A protein has these predicted regions:
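Classical Sec-dependent N-terminal signal peptides that target proteins to the secretory pathway
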Residues: 1-22
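N-terminal secretory-pathway/extracellular module detecting exported/lumenal segments
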Residues: 20-84, 90-184
Length: 184
């Protein structure tokens, strides 16, 4: 019997605490910021970012990278999606740089500028990690999470909610909107 108690004590001491996220936690404005105006994409009813998770770095050829943990409320399912996303910004594709190309006749017209921006917004993203929680904080099981991970995409198409969100993050990190950046 003593062996059983000792074994149980050892097992319980080795239990890894689980992480959860609830709506109540997202209301903590010291740690999370709600980004307004990004629910129109059909991808949820509000996007929050973890202020402490934002990490910025410079990449090759004038690119900048920003990693962030964001939470998207999904009211139809009573869930919160946690996404760790890496955004890559190609400053050569900012509006300011495209206008500069237009001025130096590297682009033929404003239509060419617009088509260039539509084809390549200059922002790409990839989901590094993805979890789903019920709004009460309980995490979904692994099978549902694996299915949801396959469905998770983060397109950054010019003019849509994902593009506006990425621009907002860029401004928060670098102090200027992405499209106002002129590469050297």
């Amino acid at each position: 019997m003593k062996v059983l108690y000792i074994t149980m004590a050892l097992v319980l001491s080795c239990v890894v605490p689980t992480y959860s996220m609830s709506m109540q936690e997202l209301q903590n404005t010291n740690h999370y910021e709600m980004l307004r105006g990004f629910g129109e994409s059909g991808n949820g009813d509000g996007t929050y970012i973890d202020k402490d998770s934002i990490k910025a770095s410079n990449g090759p050829n004038g690119t900048k990278k920003t990693a962030v943990t964001q939470y998207v409320l999904m009211p139809a399912d009573d869930t919160i999606q946690e996404k760790q996303v890496l955004y890559t910004f190609n400053t050569n594709q900012s509006f300011a740089n495209l206008i500069k190309k237009l001025d130096t006749h590297q682009l033929g017209s404003y239509k060419d500028l617009w088509l260039s921006k539509q084809k390549n917004s200059g922002i790409s993203s990839s989901i590094i990690d993805f979890k789903v929680f019920h709004v009460d904080g309980n995490q979904y099981d692994a099978q549902n999470e694996a299915r949801d991970r396959r469905m998770a995409t983060a397109p950054v198409d010019f003019g849509f909610a994902g593009y506006l969100l990425a621009n907002r993050l860029y401004e928060r990190v670098y102090g200027v909107q992405f499209d106002d950046v002129v590469a050297k």
